[in-house]
Amino acid sequence: MLNKLYDWVDERLDITPLWRDIADHEVPEHVNPAHHFSAFVYCFGGLTFFVTVIQILSGMFLTMYYVPDIKNAWESVYYLQNEVAFGQIVRGMHHWGASLVIVMMFLHTLRVFFQGAYKKPREMNWIVGVLIFMVMMGLGFTGYLLPWDMKALFATKVGLQIAEAVPLIGPAIKTLLAGDPEIVGAQTLARFFAIHVFFLPAALLGLMAAHFLMIRRQGISGPL
């Protein structure tokens, strides 16, 4: 049944060459841990992507229960944590995954830097990678406020004060993030939720697509 469906689609769209090109792509010998033990350092990028996928899937589950409102945000998180089946596990995955993805990305960045993989002709991919790092940090910052507890509230106030200290555009950045520059309240929570769930993930997906396309085009760099 599935084979017939696949053949029907393949006859019209010729999809076999597309997935065969990916499936048959050979892993370079210098990045294969089976041949070189030190090649495990090349796994940090893939591990970063793997944890990112977990973050996306667990985040989609969390949005089914989370209420981005100052009166209900904490209660919705409490309900998710204590009443929803597997809610505590999924939230724990998202919580710890947020830290793990930064660690993996940091290790990946160190590998690229110390092996000189950012040099010509891969300068553009390095820039895209740095932008991905910044987006990930933004996701961590905006997500921290969403439980709407005291720790998150005061941490966000500190973060907004840091943003305000940016020369020239600092006050505008703070107003953009917080809504009301004087109060961390309903507008701040709503904006952080929108940025965390819509704006930054959209930017992340676009940057990751560009990152992977350039890797595919240029190949994986060896030590330089």
Curated annotation (Swiss-Prot):
Please tell me where heme b 1 binds in this chain.
42, 108, 111, 211, 221
Q: Where in the cell is it found?
A: Cell membrane
What species was this sequence derived from? Geobacillus thermodenitrificans
Molecular function (GO) terms for this protein are: electron transfer activity; metal ion binding; oxidoreductase activity
- Keyword Membrane in annotation: yes
Q: Where does heme c bind?
A: 43, 216, 220
What the protein does comes down to: Component of the menaquinol:cytochrome c reductase complex.
State the name under which the record lists this protein. Answer: Menaquinol:cytochrome c reductase cytochrome b subunit
